[in-house]
Amino acid sequence: MKVCSTENMQIAERELIVSGTPARTLMKLASAGIAESLMQFFPDPGLCIAYVGKGNNGGDALTVLNILKQHGWEIGFRTAYPRNEWSELSMRQLAEISPPPQEYQAPPLPHTGKPMILLDGLLGIGAKGMLRREISALCAEMNYIRNRCGAVRTVAIDIPTGVDPDTGMPQQNAVEADFTMCIGAVKQGLLDDDATLFAGRLVCIDLPGLHVQALPATELITSSRLTKFLSARPYTDYKNKRGHIGVIAGSEGMLGAARLCCEAALRAGAGLVTLHVHKDVYPLIAPSMPPEIMVRPVDSYADISIRTFSAFLIGPGIGSVSEEDAEAIRLILETGTPTVLDA
């Protein structure tokens, strides 16, 4: 995922509009991506309540409601402002929903047995300054409902209301989201430690034709980005063709670390995994290991046959080591064999 500043995103959006893409089209494209992602995370239709501000972020939320409605969702909205203060785009998007969605005058109640989503469309990345009283009150309401009702999830559009998109600093009553649908790119503030409890899971919604200048040397690594490194295995492959990982991990009181890292090696696709442990802990750890893991007891790590292995994983849970063991580990590192070393 690209990571960008608020300024660069606003520049990219203006350039796209100037090049001939209407703002309404951008809104529909972004909202379609948000709705699609929502339905992937929540495949069973439920109730979605949009919290709508007077700007175009509210228009995004209303457009998402319209799409969800067409897929069997119940919809409604709460708003901080009278409609005569809404943006023209937001009013047009509301008018397109037929029949009109229910406007909640009081906090919505969760539906038993159905997913309930609170969709944060109160403010976008262009909002500046402290939250106004009416916005802050609805933010607090969303957080209260989410925290009191286990089946309720909050989804923020682009940025949780009350979180600075560039610094990640949250204001009082900032929306605590379970998902943030980042339009075009992830705003840099969402990666700051201060934003962790408010951003939730980040989802990037692509906008065709949007060319945003990303921050230099900054990219958010995702699972889809890593899949190219995991090639499909030929059906004729044998375990000896998929590499042999030598693991040095675990000690008395920290046996779980050995199991976790060995299972990780298997899940990564290693054909063979051999765990080396000292003889005094072998009886404790061997029975707990998955049957695919070979466990070898050693007097010292110097007993390990280095040439046997195509890669090493060293360190999880080994605790303090003797000078002899430390020297053996140094020898392994000096061979240049690919190694994951746990500090």
Where are these regions (language model features)?
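Short, solvent-exposed coil/turn elements at secondary-structure transition points
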Residues: R83, P107-L109, P160, V186, ...
